[in-house]
Design a protein with these regions (language model features):
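Basic nucleic-acid-binding interfaces
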Residues: 1-19, 24-26, 31-60
């Protein structure tokens, strides 16, 4: 999955960017606890393990 596809998936689920540090977005949800750090490398692929971890943390 590409980085921009993962960000779109998170935003569709209700996650929004609270800040960005370099090429990483820190996202938060209105009702879910915690924050997610998501790489913002455009059309570059995100590793399968990292993709799985981010989805698990997001509850997707």
């Amino acid at each position: 999955m590409k980085s921009n596809e993962l960000i779109r998936l998170l935003q569709k689920d209700g996650w929004f960017v609270i800040r960005q540090s370099g090429s990483h977005m820190i996202m938060q949800h209105a009702t879910k606890k915690g924050q997610i750090v998501c790489p913002n490398h455009g059309s570059h692929e995100v590793g399968k393990g990292l993709e799985k971890k981010i989805k698990k943390d997001a509850g997707i």
